[in-house]
Amino acid sequence: MKLHELKAAEGSRRVRNRVGRGAATGNGKTSGRGQKGQKARSGGKLRPGFEGGQLPLFRRLPKRGFTNINRKEYAIVNLDQLNKFEDGTEVTPALLVESGVVKNEKSGIKVLGNGSLDKKLTVKAHKFSASAAEAIDAKGGAHEVI
C-alpha cells in the first residue's frame, strides 16, 4: 500500500452543505432557516437562558449564599509527599515550593494525614490536621505552626 492509495473511512468526511443555491438543491430560498422571525435574520441568536419572554429559571430561583472576601485557601500537602525529603530535614514552605511539592504557597501550607510518613522530619507549616501532627510526632519528628 502506498500513500496515494489511502482512503478515508466511510462516513468520516462530510461534504459541506452549500445553501441558498436554487430550489432544486432542497436548500434554496430560505437556506434551511424556515420562514420569518428572529432566527431567520442574520445575527439572530437567542441569549443563553432565554425562554421566549417567560421569566427565566435563573431569575425565578432565589439568590443563595455569599462569597467570603476573607477566605483563605491553603496549599495542601499530604504525609506521603513528605517522604521525598531526607531523614532529619527541616521542611519549610519555601522548601516545599522549591522542590515542586506545591506550586505556590497561596495563603499558607496545610499538612494533611493522607498516606504514611516513613522519615523523621521537622515540619513547619501554617496548619496541621490532628492526624498529620500525630503521625509526624510519632516518627520522632516535630511539627511547628508558623
Swiss-Prot record:
Belongs to the universal ribosomal protein uL15 family. This is Large ribosomal subunit protein uL15. GO terms for biological process: translation. Keywords: Ribonucleoprotein, Ribosomal protein, RNA-binding, rRNA-binding. It comes from the Bacteria. Binds to the 23S rRNA. Part of the 50S ribosomal subunit. The gene is rplO. Residues 23-35 have a biased composition (Gly residues). Transmembrane segments: none annotated. Residues 1-13 have a biased composition (Basic and acidic residues). One of its GO terms (molecular function) is rRNA binding. Coiled coil: none annotated. Pfam families: Ribosomal_L27A. Residues 1-56 are annotated as: Disordered. It comes from Staphylococcus epidermidis (strain ATCC 35984 / DSM 28319 / BCRC 17069 / CCUG 31568 / BM 3577 / RP62A). GO terms for cellular component: cytosolic large ribosomal subunit.
